[in-house]
């Protein structure tokens, strides 16, 4: 048994308040992309379908002896380049292929996890993505926003601070709205440029009445896992 899933283009920020946002397939007027997976998710194929040819062509094939997760395919340069999210080396990372599925280069690598691609600036050839586990002195589940060039160079952290960050990148990839919080801190929203420079504080929650009523933040603590090593 297998499952087919249509790849679609990322939603634009200018459409975020629309009741019905347009869903557009990833591709062009003649071709679209889909993911074909086995029921056990040991086998995942990224495929293309050309209108009128009535055939599904595998472009990127993933084979593992364990369950795999997937993320949406990013299509660049008029369909001539593809960015794939994959867990093939045990960590979730990004890889660049040409339209025929030939490997071009690895974009990210290391003992950390790429969560999602938020924006690809095709003109500048820069990818904005969220990831966690890169900062050893922070909670490994806290996500940050990063940028990296399509060729794998220029990796840079955009958001800062030991918080869980929920960033949004504008459609032109010039600005970032970073909503960040932690269980023992006051939530805050700030405006950054695409290099991580803080431009302004948009809003910081007011907990004064809550604190006056006797509220106390939960206390964070650290314990060892069953292996006696992992915090």
Give the location of each predicted region.
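Generic long, charged, amphipathic alpha-helical segments
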Residues: 137-138
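Non-catalytic accessory segments flanking enzyme active sites
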Residues: 1-12, 19-25, 29-37, 42-48, ...
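Beta-propeller blade termini and top-face loops
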Residues: 131, 141-144
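Repeat-blade elements of multi-bladed beta-propeller folds
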Residues: 74-79, 121-130
């Amino acid at each position: 048994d297998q499952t087919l899933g249509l790849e679609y283009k990322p939603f634009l920020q200018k459409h975020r308040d629309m009741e019905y946002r347009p869903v557009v397939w990833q591709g062009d007027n003649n071709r679209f992309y889909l993911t074909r997976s086995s029921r056990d998710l040991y086998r995942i194929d990224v495929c293309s379908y050309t209108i009128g040819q009535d055939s599904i062509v595998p472009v990127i094939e993933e084979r593992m002896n364990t369950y795999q997760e997937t993320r949406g395919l990013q299509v660049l340069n008029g369909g001539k380049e593809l960015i794939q999210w994959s867990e093939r080396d045990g960590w979730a990372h990004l890889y660049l292929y040409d339209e025929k599925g030939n490997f071009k280069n690895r974009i990210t690598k290391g003992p950390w996890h790429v969560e999602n691609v938020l924006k690809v600036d095709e003109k500048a050839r820069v990818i904005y993505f969220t990831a966690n586990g890169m900062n050893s002195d922070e909670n490994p589940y806290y996500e940050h926003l990063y940028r990296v060039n399509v060729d794998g160079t220029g990796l840079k952290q955009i958001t800062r601070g030991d918080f869980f960050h929920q960033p949004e990148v504008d459609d032109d990839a010039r600005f970032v709205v970073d909503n960040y919080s932690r269980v023992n801190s006051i939530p805050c929203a700030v405006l950054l440029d695409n290099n991580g420079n803080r431009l302004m504080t948009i809003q910081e929650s007011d907990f004064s009445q809550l604190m006056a009523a006797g509220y106390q933040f939960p206390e964070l603590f650290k314990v060892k896992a069953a292996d006696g090593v992992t915090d």
